Amino acid sequence: MKLVIDANIPAADACFGGVGTLHRLPGREIRATDLQNADALIVRSITQVNRALLANSPVRFVGTCTIGTDHIDLDYLKERNIGFASAPGCNAEAVVDYVLSSLLTVSEREGWPLLERTVGIVGAGNVGSRLQRRLKALGVAVRVCDPPRAEQEGASGFVSLDTLIDECDVICLHTPLVKAGPHATYQLLNAQRINELAPGTLLLNAGGGDCIDGLALRSRLAGKGDITAVLDVWEDEPGIDAGLRDLVALATPHIAGHSLDGKLRGTWMIQQALAAQLNQPSGMPFSELCPSPALATLTLQSALPVEEALRLCVRAVYDVRRDHDALQRQVMLQGIAKGFDSCRANYPLRREFATLTVYLENDAVSLQPSLQAAGFQVRCG
């Protein structure tokens, strides 16, 4: 059995080596000619899987080690009776880590208390729902907009997008890209809505790049300059708008979910799905794939202000500023598109908050609820 697999998918040998022969290729360079003798195709979000790619291939299974499926022509796979699996939720915790690191960074830079702000979450799926839980556990006021869920579950607990924009200091987008239909998200934040954002609003997009009108956002930032933006996803990746990149507070190259844990979880989920299709044993448990973290423990011996303690622990595991700086460096060296892709392809090892155990001594034990709410393991005494 021949498997064509994105070269940047981790633990490929451990998960798929026993299934067949692996043929590794850069995700953006996978072509139809590479699949002429392939039985399975394993990709990430940068590979467009459609009729043009698969038409003359014997591929019987496609797996994407990502939450989203925008890059997959699902109708064509169904037409050809090609098995398919994605990895919903595999990196959701990592994206929430990214959001918290970003919010703590911007709030420190601008001098406002995050825990006293109202945060709006647009899209309460795998990521948004986890972000909601962590923020509420921290005591942050949260508003949630998710029209499809509101239709299914009832309006209680949800608000409209316009209400969310009116009531929130921070707006986090975690919507998939839906181009048509009653709940389309393409340019969900269009020019009108961007112009309606209150001065001082922080807008963070870790959902879909096309969910925001980039030109309108650039105009608002370059003109009034009275809002702040954090962007991890962009229109026209990897050739993103250099002008917009220069205006946002934090610019990162679509890496919000790029924790080692999330990547391994995605690979493992696709391995499980392929094994099921082949009627083979499911293989090793996920826990055996995860190595021990380089930093496993941290000790706080005295109490700190809560947000200061959060920043200390968050940055011990993941500091979003490093990704922002790395993108700036690589763009200067290689240009926009190559620099963007280089950051993704050579992304440094990153773990999730849950891999760090924080030991609290003396009066630092008062920090236990907040640190646990943020996602860390906590031990007192």
What is each residue range found by the language model?
Residues D6, V43-R44, C65, C172-T175, ...:
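Short, well-ordered coil/turn residues at beta-beta hairpins
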Residues M1-A38:
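N-terminal glycine-/charge-rich "phosphate-binding" loop or analogous flexible N-terminal tail
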Residues V96-W112, A137-V140, T267-A276:
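Oxidoreductase and adenylate-handling cofactor-binding alpha/beta cores
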Residues V49, A150-A242:
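Rossmann-like adenosine-cofactor binding region
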Residues P10, A137-G154:
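NAD(P)-binding Rossmann-fold cofactor-contacting core
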Residues A7, P88, V96, L115-K136:
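Glycine-rich adenosine-cofactor-binding loop
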Residues G200-P369, A374-G381:
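Rossmann-like dinucleotide-binding domain for NAD(H)/NADP(H)
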Residues D39-W112:
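Phosphate/diphosphate ligand-binding glycine-rich loop within oxidoreductases
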